[in-house]
Amino acid sequence: MKNLNMISRRSFLKAALAASAVSAMALTGCGSAASSTVSSAAVSSSAAASGSAAATGETFKVGIVNYVDHASLNQIVESVESRLDAIGKEKGVTFDYADYYANAQADQSNLNQIGADLVADSVDVIVAVATPTAATMLAAVEDTDIPVVYSAVTDPAAAGFDGEENITGTSDALNTDAIMNLIVAANPGIDTIGLLYDLSQDASTQAVADAKAFCEKNGIKVVEKNGTTTAEVQMAAEALVAAGVKAVFTPTDNTIMTAELSIYESFIEAGVQHYTGADSFALNGALVGYGVDYVQLGEATADMVSQLLCDGKTPADLPYQTFDNGIVTINTETAEALGLDLAALKEAFKPYCTEICEVTTAENFS
């Protein structure tokens, strides 16, 4: 992996990992009480665990592959690494991830190369962050015994992971109706909602369908705009502004997330409220992010890695986990710029969430 010039290494500092309990400002604390569930659709074990407990002093090679550099996915990687460090100290083993980390920068050819290199490096496990990463890594380990543990796969069934015995992980499945209810609660009588997403992002497919169904049921008109690059997303955002929408919904879409810092000011200037499927959007300027605690998601992912490597489990023994979606994150700077009463906004949101957190605009969680 060390000779892959095309692969961008992390720009964030590992020093932040030890502070994961406070790293997401107020956000991480807000999500700490969220619970997880295992999927009833997960694969049942077809074989007994083949391994045994790890020996003290043992070193495991852990490949970690990030799909693209943005706040939510970076936060997951930091959390996975921090948790693996803690588990390693507890169990007296070493998880070597530093030599086997890569960021594909949303490039499929990069993902393919990373997968091939990790297999050639004979890593013990691959942690795949985001749906495209997980799908590519699963293909890469075919005909090997290298397990894949994914994180932030919104719809594992739609991604084709059901029935696959060599993959498991954690899902950030989105409660779209809850987000749509937030929009309506903040804008009584709203008659048009914009949808901004990337058609090529599998994670957006079901959420967009759910949003359309909600709008149809409630007599709300939908205006859809799409983009696959930051430049296209900027044009799509401008088109939504021109269409006169008052609120825009975006699911857990990596393409839009990567572009959020480039579009949020245009939305603010036009008085458009952006409601999204992850806290990182709010961090990058959107009015509202809704969803899981990505620190907790990363920690649970690392726990699954430990169960595979240290406890002799197989992916088939570990059904994928989903987490309660109930955390609303409000960008207070954006709310003020839009002329919204923060106290009134929180009161309107209360019936549809478990926690309300606040952030101000930044590139990454500090």
Which positions does each model-derived feature cover?
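Bacterial lipoprotein signal-peptidase II cleavage site
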Residues: 27-41
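Hinge/cleft segment of the Venus flytrap/periplasmic-binding protein
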Residues: 307-366
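An alpha-beta-alpha
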Residues: 62, 80, 169-218, 314, ...
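Hydrophobic alpha-helical segments within soluble ligand-binding/sensing domains
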Residues: 154-164, 168-192, 292-313
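Beta-alpha junction/loop-to-helix N-cap segments that form part of ligand/metal-binding clefts
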Residues: 99-160, 253-268, 272-274
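Short beta-strand elements in bilobed, periplasmic/extracellular small-molecule ligand-binding domains
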Residues: 88-107, 166, 215-230
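N-terminal secretory signal peptides
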Residues: 1-11, 15-30
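Extracytoplasmic "Venus flytrap"
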Residues: 61-87, 98-109, 200-204, 253-258
